[in-house]
Amino acid sequence: MGRRSALALAVVSALLCQVWSSGVFELKLQEFVNKKGLLGNRNCCRGGSGPPCACRTFFRVCLKHYQASVSPEPPCTYGSAVTPVLGVDSFSLPDGAGIDPAFSNPIRFPFGFTWPGTFSLIIEALHTDSPDDLATENPERLISRLTTQRHLTVGEEWSQDLHSSGRTDLRYSYRFVCDEHYYGEGCSVFCRPRDDAFGHFTCGDRGEKMCDPGWKGQYCTDPICLPGCDDQHGYCDKPGECKCRVGWQGRYCDECIRYPGCLHGTCQQPWQCNCQEGWGGLFCNQDLNYCTHHKPCRNGATCTNTGQGSYTCSCRPGYTGANCELEVDECAPSPCKNGASCTDLEDSFSCTCPPGFYGKVCELSAMTCADGPCFNGGRCSDNPDGGYTCHCPLGFSGFNCEKKMDLCGSSPCSNGAKCVDLGNSYLCRCQAGFSGRYCEDNVDDCASSPCANGGTCRDSVNDFSCTCPPGYTGKNCSAPVSRCEHAPCHNGATCHQRGQRYMCECAQGYGGPNCQFLLPEPPPGPMVVDLSERHMESQGGPFPWVAVCAGVVLVLLLLLGCAAVVVCVRLKLQKHQPPPEPCGGETETMNNLANCQREKDVSVSIIGATQIKNTNKKADFHGDHGAEKSSFKVRYPTVDYNLVRDLKGDEATVRDTHSKRDTKCQSQSSAGEEKIAPTLRGGEIPDRKRPESVYSTSKDTKYQSVYVLSAEKDECVIATEV
């Protein structure tokens, strides 16, 4: 099992070597002859089920570097191989795969380095009893051994050889061929044809790169540009094109780009504008020799350059215009008189006079007023120099008043008025809003003061507009603005216009001038509220005394009801209170209080004036320590002395000593001695011999202090403010 694993590992190694190899040494075993079937030690091959001396032959091949004295021992530096059993005694081996699919003839030894040109070869023929046992370490299995060293050049041709040892003959052949894409004497030149971004080439016989048409460079990655493309200013990404770099243009990128806007200039480098002769300025757009370049003057006029891009033309007689392009029409001012016809000449004019007239402009007449030349009632007068003049009546013209005039032809009427020709005069029928002889005046539509209620009138064509004061609207400001227009009533109320006022008809449950208040008890029907003048934006009307009185009565009734409820509650509370205990016939009083009353409720703390809340109300000091104990109140009319703090903790002590105090109150005289309690709530008093320390005073100067006695005080003493 271990040998099979070793064989599989060797095959995988050989395959990996083939992947990365540059060439392959190939050994072809052709024929092996073992005439007597003997081993190398002349013993007969035994074992197995075949005939005696039948040697089941397999081969071990070892390829190593060139050695002058070849050693058959490992390592096989170039590779080794062990074949399966290929035959018995004498046999021939065909090319390709044999009986055993694990063997292929020739045996291949891939190389991952340059072929050195020399090698040493060891071929051992071995015998095995079992096809599964292909161990080569046992020398007893050896049939024959071939050791040789050779020089070998790379090529496709096989080198034939025959090894004879006397008892055995081995005929074999070998060669070294380069792997695909490898070339050269040692298969060290790598060349793989490609046509992509990394190259465009094929490979020659010796592995040289032969660029595809249109490509050049060491790896054929540089395209050959269009023939004539400038080497510096042009480039290409693929063969046959010529792309220009920035600032250059043209088919071959040999033309510089001029400065933008340059008209009559050239450049030697990009963005230049070198003006041509006769041109100036930043953009070479100012013609310094306009007359020569443009020849603007026509009709034989003389051109004179007057500056950059300017000129003047001196026209010949009979021509005018900036470039003398206009021929002067000498007949334009109608120089011919008396109905003569004018003919324009190149530099003058000619008048063709009607019968009876002569002169350059036919100004002279051969007729007189005696001949009656004037028509249509024209008045004739003789001229001192000869001839006559006809004074035409209105509506006629011409030298002899022979032409009837169109009085409306000159459009004398303005502002779209229609002109009516009356023969001797005309009449303008004006459009609405205009007046005057020629309808030139706009009729003042505000003259009649159409705007009412102090509105301002603005006149327009056959119309007017009024700017109304607040409270009015309409064409003439005659319509008052509706007070309900802006929806003053709230909560679904209905607005009613009442002249200059409005009224809100409130929905059930709402009230107020604008129905903005929610009523606690809505009236049974809808409420109509007449707004006061403060809400109506106008003054006038009586003050609503009835509503005010009704409101006051409602408030008083409410207060009386509350007072009655309070009195009832207090009466019920007094009924549930226990009756006060009698003082046992004690008649001695102090500050209108009996001794028993003074004895009770003396267990209070000393509180400074700064700790008393002044509320300007009557203070109610009430102590309730049980049903068996009566209560009393000390009233201070202006100060509320809050003495509730920490009184509950002393209730038990007060209950225990209550009966003892009552007895004491009855037997004690008014001049009895005071016994000081050992402790006070205001603080500990370590010395019992200082009775005056029981009554402490506050240092507060704003208010007087309340003297507080301990609950354990024996005498019936009450503290008060003096």
Swiss-Prot record:
Induction / repression: Induced by PTF1A in multipotent pancreatic progenitor cells. Induced by CDX1 and CDX2 during somitogenesis and goblet cell differentiation.
Region named Interaction with MAGI1: 719-722
Ranges of residues in domain DSL: 176-220
Record cross-link Glycyl lysine isopeptide (Lys-Gly) (interchain with G-Cter in ubiquitin), residues: 613
Keywords: Cell junction, Cell membrane, Developmental protein, Differentiation, Disulfide bond, EGF-like domain, Glycoprotein, Isopeptide bond, Membrane, Notch signaling pathway, Nucleus, Phosphoprotein, Repeat, Signal, Transmembrane, Transmembrane helix, Ubl conjugation
Record-level Gene Ontology MF annotations: calcium ion binding; Notch binding; receptor ligand activity; scaffold protein binding; Tat protein binding
Name of the protein this chain belongs to: Delta-like protein 1
